Amino acid sequence: MKAWERTDVPMRTAHLLRINSYMDIAILSMWTMSPRVDVMIGMAEASLRGKTPGGKDDEALEKVRDLVREGREYLAGGEFLVAMGRMRVAHDLLALHIIRLSCE
C-alpha cells in the first residue's frame, strides 16, 4: 500500500501537521515583514492543494484554503491587519481540526 492510500488517523494527522507548519512559517513571515512573505504564503497555499489522505479532511480544509487565499489577496492590497486576521483564523481552524482528529 502506498502512503497516500492510507487513511488512518496517524497519516491524516501527519499530513495536517505538515500544512500547519507551513501556516506557521507564513504567519511569522507576515509578522516580521519578510520580503519573502508572498513565497511563504504560496508554500502554505500549495500545501493545501489537492486531496487529503482518503479525502476525509477535504471539507475542513476547503475553509482553510479560502481564508489563506483571501489573506494573500488582502496582503497584496496592503491590508495587513485584515490579511493577518484571515491567516490566523485559517491557522486556528486547522489546529482545531487536528485536535478533533486526535480524539477519533
Features from the language model and the residues they span:
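Long, charged/polar, soluble alpha-helical segments
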Residues: 1-104
